[in-house]
Design a protein with these regions (language model features):
Chain B
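Surface-exposed binding/hinge segments that line
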Residues: 108, 120, 127, 143-193, ...
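Ligand/substrate-recognition segments at binding pockets and active sites
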Residues: 220, 365-442, 467, 488, ...
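Extracytoplasmic/peripheral linker and loop segments enriched in polar/acidic and small residues
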Residues: 313, 325, 405-421, 449-521, ...
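Long beta-strand-rich cores associated with HINT superfamily self-processing modules
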Residues: 518-544
């Protein structure tokens, strides 16, 4: 097991290096001016060139990449051009906010996704299956920014039950787990959960149907195991795949949703990315993408390890 | 360590709980829950503007974090809504040019002005602030503030304190527009910079200016809370509310939802399709003319079709501005010139902007074009952008209008920041992709931003932003007259003559002016929407 984990960790190094190169290149080849956030629109070309020098953008791309990577491996992701604040601090604060939101969205998505999936798979072709499948298809298909706006119109503007924007009274820096704050998470978390819920439900439904058709299930029934016992075996067999899918979905959610976080002004990584893109804040953009990519890589690693623990056949494969 | 006994602990806890309970509904820290009312504003910016002095985020940054926390030597008078704003004494009580040497200006510093940290504003502090922006080897040089401020004061060649109360500024050449340039510059406290370890990032969290508001709380990207500065030198402008909370909510529908849901009292730039329903729901909608215009900037390099004045006039006569007003739910002022109608510098142009399709067709025919044999040309536009209003439907309307009189316009659509770079590079640069015009909206508040930067020969790229490479010795002479018009009345007249030439020669496609729409709750009272990019929040009160 340890050798397998060690091997997986070693594999992540070239992946991380590739990710850092790709994210640097993507950010730099896209059109626009990295100083757009610090220069007034009517600044002259001469002033722009002066500022390029002051910010070090007059250096060659390999030189800039080398410097950035060298600092990044030491934990220094640079300084935001637009704000002058350390990128690492900005990203970690935003990631904490997104993590909070993603965790709630994951719980909602996983619980309801599994529920719909197991029910639909277990009662295949019944009306329950059709209803659960319909809900999961809606979850996958509905544009979530649209859903977010509809939820805001209904629950904030019309009914006034839940706040429409922000991360609670006083902002995210004074977060506490009380209803005053949690109420700000409800609408964005529900909006965020619909896609993973749909994906998990569809995956689990197919898995359950496949497992139920296997011979060992017939064997279990033949040995007199009751429905609950059979169901437990089905769940255990479906768990590794469901977990892997959930892990991937959590990775996506941790990336924050630019659209959802913008609609709800939730100060997470999506909101940060949106600001960085529109301000052409290259250090912030690079740093945020890198951290999110690292999250994703590490999350995949963790899922692989947990899957192996649940199903030793994977290690042997 | 101080010992806290049980009784005082209970008393302070009860007080804190009461404060939290009162403030919780407003999303405020306990200190905010006090008399005077709290004004919560949703800005369109995606971040809190730079707090250290010279703000970023354009006009909005200066509006909320510039003229609130800071002052300039010369401020804008924002007390009237019924006329265009003029300059008024700020940290300087008087400024005058030396008659013997018109490159030399003397500013008399206002006595007894204190920064929020208690230190005193002097001419030396002013020099320190100019160094902050212009002198790269000074310890306080801040590249972020420099990027914002340097381009605002192109005429300044030198400055020195003659005494604590007298500041001398010298210019590269005689320039009567200097006071308008200086009005951009915000003055931060040298003492606070020292106290914060000479670190601008630390100052950003606890800045100190001389303005009527003091920054009390700052959560990057989420909120800034300003409180009145009781020691403000202009007692009439000490804020009447107890706190102003600024929230960055860049998405227009999210701002509307926040207003409807009671999370904020005031939103900037509501979505135009939400205005009618907001009004119906009892919210106030305020709007007024302000120095903004929405134009097509014509290229004037050799080969440009816009070098023919008949073509320029025809385009201006073809635009259906009333139709556009309907398109924008009345949230615009149809252009009568480059400046807003009734502006003090409007003058009396002879070419009247109106919709006259027949006259436009005649002019185009004289120039050799008809709807059947149209003038084909390309125009650069962006699908969105600061101040660009609703560029896609607006440009499409103009495209149709112009097609009726003999133009075949092809749009080259680029992203907004790309358009800015093209604008800086000039019409002859390959990045302009052969376009002969560009849709651009302008901040036109002072002589330089309103006129000089667009058409002065010396400001052709890369030296400036004369994108169209326009060059006319007569116009340059008018600019020179303006720069030497040291008497305010003479300056006004010089500005009028320039504006008359802008309109009479149809130097731009002059389409519309934005009206700075804002939506606010009925309890917000006392707001006077000045005809300016900046606004005064001091007189506002919140009704019970």
């Amino acid at each position: 097991m340890l050798a397998y984990i060690g091997r997986r960790v070693v594999y992540t190094v070239p992946i991380m290096l590739g990710v850092s190169l790709v994210c640097f290149a993507l950010v730099h080849i896209s059109p626009g001016d990295p100083l757009v956030s610090v220069l007034p629109a009517d600044a002259s070309e001469q002033l722009r060139l002066t500022m390029m020098r002051l910010y070090g953008f007059d250096r060659s791309y390999p030189e800039q990449f080398g410097l950035w990577l060298w600092r990044a491996v030491q934990g220094d992701l640079g300084t935001s051009i637009a704000t002058g604040r350390a990128v690492a601090t900005e990203v970690l604060r935003a990631a904490g906010n997104t993590l909070r939101l993603a965790a709630l969205a994951t719980v909602i998505g996983f619980v309801f996704g599994c529920l719909f999936g197991f029910v639909a798979g277990y009662f295949r072709d019944s009306w329950v299956d059709k209803l659960a499948s319909l809900l999961s298809v809606i979850g996958v298909s509905v544009p979530h920014y649209w859903l977010g706006m509809v939820l805001v119109i209904v629950f904030s503007s019309q009914l006034g039950w839940l706040p429409a924007t922000g991360a609670g009274p006083g902002g995210s820096s004074s977060w506490v787990w009380d209803w005053e704050h949690v109420s700000h998470m409800v609408l964005p978390a529900i909006t965020m959960s619909v896609i993973p819920m749909g994906i998990i439900a569809r995956t689990v439904r197919a898995l359950v149907a496949e497992i139920l058709a296997q011979e060992f299930v017939i064997g279990l029934k033949a040995r007199g195991l009751n429905e609950v016992g059979v169901f437990a075996h089905v769940v255990k067999n479906a768990a590794p795949t469901a977990l892997a899918v959930m892990g991937l979905q959590l990775g996506y959610l941790l990336g924050g949703s630019i659209l959802i976080e913008t609609v709800f002004s939730w100060p997470g990584t999506g909101f940060l990315l949106n600001a960085a893109i529109f301000q052409r804040d290259l250090p912030l953009l690079q740093g945020t993408i890198l951290v999110l990519a690292m999250f994703f890589v590490l999350l995949n690693l963790a899922v692989d390890v947990v899957q192996t623990m649940l199903d030793p056949r994977i290690e042997r494969g | 360590m101080t010992q806290l006994d049980r009784r005082s602990f209970l008393a302070s806890s009860a007080g804190a709980a009461a404060g939290v309970a009162a403030g919780a509904g407003l999303g405020l820290s306990p200190a905010a829950a006090q008399a005077g009312g709290v004004l919560r504003i949703a800005m369109t910016a995606s971040d809190i503007p730079l707090t250290t002095g010279q703000t970023d985020q354009g006009g909005e940054g200066q509006r909320f974090m510039g003229y609130t926390v800071y002052d300039s030597l010369i401020n804008w008078d924002l007390s009237r809504s019924d006329r265009s704003s003029s300059l008024t004494p700020g940290l300087a009580t008087k400024w005058e040019v030396d008659p013997a040497n018109t490159n030399r200006w003397i500013f008399t510093i206002r006595e007894g002005v204190q920064f929020h940290d208690g230190s005193t504003f002097t001419a030396e502090a002013a020099v320190w602030n100019f160094d902050k922006l212009l002198k790269e080897d000074s310890p306080q040089f801040d590249r972020r503030q420099s990027a914002q401020g340097r381009s605002r004061i192109p005429s300044i060649a030198g400055y020195r304190a003659l005494s604590p109360g007298v500041l001398e500024i010298t210019t590269r050449a005689p320039d009567a527009t200097l006071p308008y340039q200086v009005a951009w510059i915000m003055f931060s406290s040298p003492a606070q910079w020292e106290a914060m370890g000479r670190n601008w990032d630390a100052v950003a969290l606890r800045p100190s200016g001389t303005g009527p508001w003091r920054l009390d709380r700052f959560v990057p990207r989420e909120r800034a809370e300003l409180v009145p500065f009781p020691g403000y030198w202009d007692k009439a402008r000490v804020p009447k509310t107890s706190r102003m909370v600024l929230l960055p909510i860049p998405e227009a529908n999210a701002r509307v939802a926040a207003l409807r849901g009671g999370q904020v009292d005031w939103i900037e730039a509501p979505a135009s399709d939400a205005i009618a329903s907001l009004r119906q729901a009892g919210f106030q909608i305020t709007a007024n003319a302000y120095p903004h215009n929405w134009t097509w900037h014509f290229a004037r390099n050799p080969g440009s079709p816009w070098n023919d004045v008949r073509v320029r006039r025809a385009a201006n006569l073809a635009v259906d501005r009333q139709g556009m007003k309907q398109l924008l739910a009345d949230m615009m002022i149809p252009a009568e010139g480059f400046l807003t109608p009734g502006h003090a510098w409007f003058g009396n142009p002879t070419f009247k902007l109106r919709t006259d399709v027949d006259a436009a067709k005649r002019l185009m025919a004289e120039a050799g074009f008809t709807p059947q044999r149209p003038l084909r040309t390309k125009v650069l536009i962006a699908p969105s952008g600061s101040g660009q209003m609703q560029p896609l439907p607006m440009n499409e309307l103009i495209q149709q209008n112009l097609a009726d009189v003999g133009f075949a316009i092809e749009f080259e659509v680029v992203e907004w920041n790309t358009l800015i770079n093209i604008w800086r590079a000039g019409a002859a640069h390959p990045s302009s992709r052969g376009a002969s015009a560009m849709n651009y909206s302008y901040f036109i508040q002072d002589p330089f931003t309103a006129f000089i930067r667009h058409l002065a020969t010396e400001l052709q790229p890369p030296a400036g932003t004369n994108w169209g490479l326009y060059s006319d010795p007569d116009m340059d002479r008018l600019f020179q007259d303006l720069r030497t018009a040291f008497d305010p009345a003479a300056l006004d007249r010089a500005m009028q003559r320039i504006h008359e030439k802008y309109v009479d020669e149809a130097l731009f496609l002059m389409v519309t002016h934005d009206v700075g729409a804002r939506a606010m709750h009925r309890r917000v009272q006392g707001f006077v929407q000045a005809q300016n990019w900046f606004q005064d929040f001091s007189p506002i009160t919140i009704a019970g």
